[in-house]
């Protein structure tokens, strides 16, 4: 049995066994487990499993195990359950001889009560953030891959212009790399439409069509469509992914309503056609112009804050981003990043936000130096620090800095210092979203690599110094426990 399989089985036992699991899924670093009864979960046992870097209780129990490991653990859990990742796990409650119906009814009432409380706790903002995350998290590997390939093409192009390399085959290679990159970025609206449809309960293919509609691929020459509000020609992609997400949400409402009123015999033919016609017209003439205004204004405001605020804005963004990640609010920036890339070719917000993770790495290095006797902490750092350098910060947040308290605050200060440097230098952007830390370096636009490196090193140093001086307690340094 592999280490990941053992970890999966220990997690299953800690959450109350397979009989208490409704479904299992995962993101880049977390196994997300939906349980039937929260009271059967042994939180302390779960947190102390070797390999578990943190536990977050939300609508699902989120167990942080780190990148790479998470896929193997989640897949083994799904394999043991006999269903695919994300699918509900069947449980047999029909055995009347073994079943106490009175207890089952009481348990069901209790579960419904807890579910109602959870609904009240999870407000509209949380639902919006979760939807944004569910739409874009599956696309992150594609963003990273396409962005890196585009970055290589840009480097080769710069080397050709400078005269360091030459040849027709280099030109062809650059062209091929750009074609691969555009396979993601040029059709992002379609991918977004498909994922949004899955999230909102519409047919994924119809969501993709609505996303593709915003590209206006059927327009050529003089057959232009006009913006009904300004009288100017509509531009392909106007409204960006904000418009696509809103349009697909409307699509889900229209499609569900049509399924209720269209006879079953013609539902599969009539419903898709009518839904596409209604929402397609609304998208072209209403949603695209309005969403275009919203996205343009939003990007202008963010760019203005960064350019005018400079050092101050950089510090605030860099210092506040870790708390936003902790609360799950960082996903709200994903559409902003993408719109900035669509409009100007780069997001100038991401490199500043990336300094938060760098500040945390600096804090972790200080803990490694200061807490030599705390072997539990150092063992956790061994697994969390390498991926922290690569921009994956959740193992450090939930496994190290947040449980300890003080290092989380000093890490935020380090991130703010790095953000101030990036903001002060200015015009440091990223051509794609996804990674941060050292991994973001190939995606930096306009050859501003040295500026980004300066920000990283400053954030590392700031997080290290602040944590070394103010971020530890005597208990942290002298005990073998992860915490005060």
Swiss-Prot record:
The active site is at residue 27. The EIIB domain is phosphorylated by phospho-EIIA on a cysteinyl or histidyl residue, depending on the transported sugar. Then, it transfers the phosphoryl group to the sugar substrate concomitantly with the sugar uptake processed by the EIIC domain. It is a multi-pass membrane protein. PANTHER family: PHOSPHOTRANSFERASE SYSTEM TRANSPORT PROTEIN, PTS SYSTEM N-ACETYLMURAMIC ACID-SPECIFIC EIIBC COMPONENT. Pathway: Cell wall biogenesis; peptidoglycan recycling. The chain crosses the membrane at residues 135-155, 160-180, 200-220, 234-254, 274-294, 305-325, 349-369, 384-404, 408-428, 450-470. GO terms for molecular function: kinase activity; protein-N(PI)-phosphohistidine-sugar phosphotransferase activity; protein-phosphocysteine-N-acetylmuramate phosphotransferase system transporter activity. GO terms for cellular component: plasma membrane. This is PTS system MurNAc-GlcNAc-specific EIIBC component. It comes from Staphylococcus aureus (strain bovine RF122 / ET3-1). GO terms for biological process: peptidoglycan turnover; phosphoenolpyruvate-dependent sugar phosphotransferase system. It is an enzyme of class 2 (transferase). The phosphoenolpyruvate-dependent sugar phosphotransferase system (sugar PTS), a major carbohydrate active transport system, catalyzes the phosphorylation of incoming sugar substrates concomitantly with their translocation across the cell membrane. This system is involved in the uptake and phosphorylation of MurNAc-GlcNAc, the principle peptidoglycan turnover product of S.aureus, yielding cytoplasmic MurNAc 6P-GlcNAc. Keywords: Cell membrane, Kinase, Membrane, Phosphotransferase system, Sugar transport, Transferase, Transmembrane, Transmembrane helix, Transport. It holds the Pfam family PTS_EIIB. It comes from the Bacteria. Residues 130-484 form the PTS EIIC type-1 domain. Residues 5-87 form the PTS EIIB type-1 domain. Its EC number is 2.7.1.-. It is found in: Cell membrane. It catalyses: N-acetyl-beta-D-muramate-(1->4)-N-acetyl-D-glucosamine(out) + N(pros)-phospho-L-histidyl-[protein] = 6-phospho-N-acetyl-beta-D-muramate-(1->4)-N-acetyl-D-glucosamine(in) + L-histidyl-[protein]. Its main location: membrane.
């Amino acid at each position: 049995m592999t280490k990941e399989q053992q970890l999966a089985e220990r997690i299953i036992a800690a959450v109350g066994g397979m009989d208490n699991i409704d479904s299992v899924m995962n993101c880049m670093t977390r196994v997300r487990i939906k349980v039937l009864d929260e009271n059967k979960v042994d939180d302390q046992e779960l947190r102390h499993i070797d390999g578990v870097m943190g536990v977050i209780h939300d609508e699902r129990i989120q167990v942080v195990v780190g990148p790479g490991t998470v896929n193997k653990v989640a897949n083994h859990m799904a394999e043991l359950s006999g269903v695919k990742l994300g699918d509900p796990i069947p449980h047999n409650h029909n055995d009347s001889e073994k079943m106490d119906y009175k207890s089952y009814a009481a348990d069901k009432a209790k579960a419904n009560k807890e579910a109602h409380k959870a609904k009240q706790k999870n407000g509209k903002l949380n639902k919006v953030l979760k939807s944004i995350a569910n739409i874009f998290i599956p696309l992150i590997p594609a963003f990273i891959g396409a962005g890196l390939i585009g970055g290589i093409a840009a480097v080769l192009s710069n080397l050709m212009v400078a005269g360091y390399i030459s040849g027709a085959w280099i030109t062809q290679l650059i062209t091929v790399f750009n074609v691969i990159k555009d396979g993601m970025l040029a059709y992002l609206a379609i991918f977004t439409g498909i994922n949004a449809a899955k999230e909102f309960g519409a047919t994924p293919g119809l969501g993709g069509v609505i996303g593709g509609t915003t590209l206006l691929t059927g327009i050529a020459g003089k057959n232009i469509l006009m913006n009904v509000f300004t009288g100017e020609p509509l531009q392909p992609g106007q409204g960006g992914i904000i418009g696509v997400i809103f349009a697909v949400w409307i699509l889900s409402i229209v499609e569900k309503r049509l399924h209720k009123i269209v006879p079953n015999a013609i539902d599969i033919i009539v419903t898709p056609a009518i839904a596409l016609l209604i929402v397609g017209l609304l998208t072209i003439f209403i949603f695209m112009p309005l969403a275009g205004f919203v996205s343009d204004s939003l990007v202008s405001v963010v760019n203005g804050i960064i350019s005018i605020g400079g050092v101050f804005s950089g510090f605030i963004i860099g210092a506040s981003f870790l708390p936003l990640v902790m609360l799950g609010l960082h996903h709200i920036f994903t559409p902003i990043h993408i719109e900035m890339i669509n409009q100007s070719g780069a997001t100038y917000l991401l490199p500043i936000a990336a300094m938060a993770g760098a500040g945390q790495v600096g804090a972790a290095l200080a803990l490694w130096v200061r807490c030599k006797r705390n072997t539990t902490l150092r063992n956790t750092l061994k697994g969390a620090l390498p991926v922290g350098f690569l921009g994956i910060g959740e193992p450090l947040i939930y496994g190290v800095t947040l449980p300890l308290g003080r290092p989380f605050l000093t890490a935020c200060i380090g991130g703010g210092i790095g953000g101030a440097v990036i903001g002060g230098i200015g015009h440091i952007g990223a051509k794609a979203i996804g990674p941060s830390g050292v991994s973001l370096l190939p995606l930096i636009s306009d050859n501003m690599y040295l500026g980004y490196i300066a920000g990283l090193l400053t954030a590392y140093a700031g997080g290290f110094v602040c944590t070394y001086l103010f971020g530890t307690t005597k208990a942290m340094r002298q005990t073998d426990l992860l915490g005060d």
